[in-house]
């Protein structure tokens, strides 16, 4: 790795990690917990920052194809610096798609499935996708930070959140590590034997 690149990426990672703790602190307060509640769960967690390259499209790319189909992220929250090209869309409550306007001054934040599970749906996972550009020659780089809790964290919906969401647990009792593995198997990035 180019030393200058590593220095810049390390600094960006630490700044985004610091921001994630502030956001998780706000979420914790909103939930009526102490400010460190969610942040402490991510200490020594599986948080990862990826650089994703969406190459230019081939001439045979079918009409209506997307770069990344509709999905929700597995983790607690995702922080996303503005990508090099448009394409990100989020699903509204009515099922319609809203284009996310990129702006280098802002960080986009998505809530993920693990936070939804833990809060029994008080925090909903953000359904999103990446659509193809109008120009097939356009490439796109994206750099999400997926903020994960430690594997041992129990994601069973907490009783206080169950009572706030109708009194019935809507999500499974599972640890973060098992949840991550289950989802990686579902998307073909792990096997059930791992």
Place the predicted regions along the sequence by residue.
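C-terminal flanking tails of non-heme Fe-dependent oxygenases
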Residues: 6-194
């Amino acid at each position: 790795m180019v030393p200058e690149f590593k220095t810049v990426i390390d600094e960006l990672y630490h700044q985004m990690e610091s921001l994630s703790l502030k956001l998780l602190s706000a979420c914790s307060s909103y939930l009526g917990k102490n400010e460190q509640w969610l942040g402490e769960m991510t200490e020594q967690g599986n948080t990862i920052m990826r650089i994703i390259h969406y190459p230019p499209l081939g001439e045979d790319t079918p009409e209506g194809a997307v770069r990344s189909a509709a999905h929700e992220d597995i983790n607690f929250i995702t922080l996303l610096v503005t990508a090099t090209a448009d394409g990100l869309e989020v699903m509204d409550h009515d099922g319609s798609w809203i284009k996310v306007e990129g702006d280098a001054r802002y960080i986009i934040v998505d809530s993920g499935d693990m936070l939804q599970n833990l809060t029994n749906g008080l925090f909903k996972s953000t359904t999103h996708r990446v659509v193809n550009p109008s120009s097939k020659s356009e490439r796109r780089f994206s750099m999400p930070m997926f903020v994960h809790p430690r594997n041992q964290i129990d994601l069973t919906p907490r009783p206080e959140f169950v009572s706030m969401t109708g009194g019935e647990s809507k999500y499974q009792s599972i640890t973060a590590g098992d949840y991550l593995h289950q989802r990686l198997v579902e998307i073909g990035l792990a096997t059930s034997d791992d």
